[in-house]
Amino acid sequence: MALKILERIFGDYSAKVVKRHQRTVALINSLEPEMQKLSDAELAHKTVEFKERIARGETLEQILPEAFAVVREASIRTTGRRPFDVQLIGGIVLHEGNIAEMKTGEGKTLVAAMPLYLNALLGRGCHLVTVNDYLAKVGRDDIGRIYRFLGMSCGLIVHGLTSAQRREAYNCDITYGTNNEFGFDYLRDNMAMHPQDMVHREFFYAIVDEADSILIDEARTPLIISGPSGKPAEMYYTFAKIAERLKRDEDYIVEEKEKRVAPTEEGIAKVEKWLNVDHLYEGENQQLVHYLNNAIKAKELFHRDRDYVVKDGQVIIVDEFTGRLMFGRRWSDGLHQAVEAKEGVKIEEETQTLATITFQNYFRMYKKLAGMTGTALTEEEEFRKIYGLDVIAIPTNKPMIRIDHPDVVYKTVKAKFKAVADDVEERHKRGQPVLVGTVSIEKSEYLSQILTRRGIPHQVLNAKHHEREAEIVAQAGRFGAVTIATNMAGRGTDILLGGNPDFAARQRMRAEGYAPELIVAATDIIPSQDPEVQAAREVYLQYLKEEEAKCAEEAEKVRAVGGLCVIGTERHEARRIDNQLRGRAGRQGDPGESRFYVSLEDDLMRLFGGEMVQNLMNKLGIEDDVPIDSPMVSRAIENAQKKVEARNFDIRKHVLQYDDVMNTQRELIYKQRRQILEGHDTREVVLDAIAATAQSIVEEGVPEDVYFEEWDPSILVALAEDNGIPKGAVNVEDLKAAVEGVRREQEGREKLAKVIEQAAIRAYEEKEARLGAETMRQLERFLLLRTVDEKWMDHLDAMDDLREGVGLRAYGQRDPLIEYKMEAMEMFNNMIRSIQRDMVRNLFIFEVVREPQRPRIMIESGSQGAAPRQPVRAEGKKVGRNDPCPCGSGKKYKFCCGRAANA
């Protein structure tokens, strides 16, 4: 209410921004006739002219109108598309470092071209971040034509590229890629052993496509590079059997809202008896608690065909936001192994973290960050507080005429799905295309069975049928089409009324026996010189023309019956996910409808607010199959969603507070590591380490609780030798002589440390003279990098353990976050001291020998901090020319990324 009053007084912020930018748009439009007169060469030369003007002191803001006008004209000449005025406004919003909320079908891909071109004029590299390899490649190939026409290079970062290919892509003016690949490259750079292995440039400017998905949904998802930990797999099978024997609410408690489980006293007693151990929570047995909790979580919180599927003997995660199968990703902390044990499939080895960063901290490294999405306003506060980004709603090019019907609420799931089937059947008879959104594979298959029994032809799109995703979604707007889809339906593929002529033309070519790779090459944006491909392209263009005529005719029939109808079978936790589903209908001014069917047995209502409504319905004696349409129920649903959104925001904010501590430490370690890698003077680092080691030897050998007169010099000699200082370098006589006549204990300790330090430096200089300065620097660099990596890896594990246990401090009336910060700093300081001591020890012990280097085994992963982690495994196999391209486009490598690699 207060917000509405403020809006009436001060006006809507987005509307003010849009109005302000309309003056710039008018200026861009006034330049259009001038741009149209330029030849291709003259238009392309504008890039050189802009760079010269910037070198003379002009700002990007001064150049913006002309640069946008140039990109608009280049787009017309290369892609045949002219950016609308609202797209120009979106481009300005992105240049200013904001989130542009643009509805589905409004051409976000083209919008990004203008600010990317403008910022790339500075020569510092700009990134366009997408959610998958396919969209990154389509963007690079399609919009990349504009950049190349204007004399700018455009690179692509996808899975399966070599370091050289990645470095080349990053050195381009503009680079398209996925959030995972950008993040992993950053981590890999900070694990590199040679400068030439590093690929990233500076973090200058990035536009994040589907910003809500990457910056909000995956904000708690750490990217993890990990290696084998060597833990046994048998225990997971043992505890899977134990979990099956335990009873819910009697032997353990499940908190579904928090996704937590806790064994009861009765349950613990049973487990101790079955395992024949005395105390489950003491000593070495504590590791068993980890196995037990994971086994119970796997049993109660992770369900087959909802959270994962079992395919070819493997447990494959289903993305909760998109419904896609996440091949190669694994939950960490032993959870994936527990699910594998529950399903009785082969358990893969557990891993240990080598390097990690969350998307929140990765994207906050950019000097300027912007984003595009169809749904962001509901998360406006989070974008502003976490990333410092304002959300600006961009008006649609044509008025939105979609009809959004009020929710229909039923008591039971069964009654709800019957009503959905009735609605689908009635619309199907009229020929109106229907897209039904479900929240899980299980629900989509349940509805499919109902429609099959009624004889309604339909397509099912879920994680089990992901291979045909784009094809099924593209034809969901045909006359009479019925499509059932999980959340994956939507992003990346437009639903055109009357069907998609491009997909229809491809289908005809497949039916006539054209090879799949030939169809891919013939329909590629990049023209081919191959005569066979050119002939196939002629056929494709002919079929495309015919299908366009058919689809246009069918589109009119669909518009006459109301356009695409979107039916949601359940409200999602976040309103924006519901809005994404609604947004599939009514694109670009098309007619359309949407309606949500809800039951009080749905997870959202069951966990977050359906009890009051349930009690009211029971008191009124409302039957299961009688729908409710009441403002009170609608408010209850909206309040439940707001409650969950606020809770999830708090979780992400809480995670960030903890991760900021780790982030500060990460930046310090990576900065020092990079300096070593780039050839900074390692001798100074070693001398500092020797001084620190000498100090720690004295602290250990002459502790403060020992009278100085009672100290034993032989202990210091032994400690010096334990720390790698050559035997005889430190002797008892020198130590005694150093403190002779000293009265103050502190002064005595300082003198002892100086004796040990000088002895170590003499030994160090002798080794340097023997090996030569250059070899010594190489040895130092290698040992420093190796020691830092090993200690950092151990530190990550220790910080994870601290994070898991620190919450219990709240029971002692202590703030867990403050406790975490204090202990984390102490642990970090201990790690630095440990690095210094190990470095000194190894430097004296190691001798230079020529030996082949063993490859490091690495696994890349993404995970969720508060939610279970989801690692991604990286295969090191070389891709053959005729193999399927690893980017997921469906093309052969030689027709896809291989073309860019060999260009």
Curated annotation (Swiss-Prot):
Basic and acidic residues bias (residue ranges): 872-881
UniProt subunit comment: Monomer and homodimer. Part of the essential Sec protein translocation apparatus which comprises SecA, SecYEG and auxiliary proteins SecDF. Other proteins may also be involved.
Record has Zinc as a keyword: yes
Job of this protein: Part of the Sec protein translocase complex. Interacts with the SecYEG preprotein conducting channel. Has a central role in coupling the hydrolysis of ATP to the transfer of proteins into and across the cell membrane, serving as an ATP-driven molecular motor driving the stepwise translocation of polypeptide chains across the membrane.
Chain residues that bind ATP: Q87, G105, E106, G107, K108, T109, D494
Molecular-function annotations in GO: ATP binding; metal ion binding; protein-exporting ATPase activity
Organism encoding this protein: Symbiobacterium thermophilum (strain DSM 24528 / JCM 14929 / IAM 14863 / T)
Annotated EC: 7.4.2.8
Bilayer topology: Peripheral membrane protein
Name of the molecule in the record: Protein translocase subunit SecA
Chain spans, region Disordered: 861-883
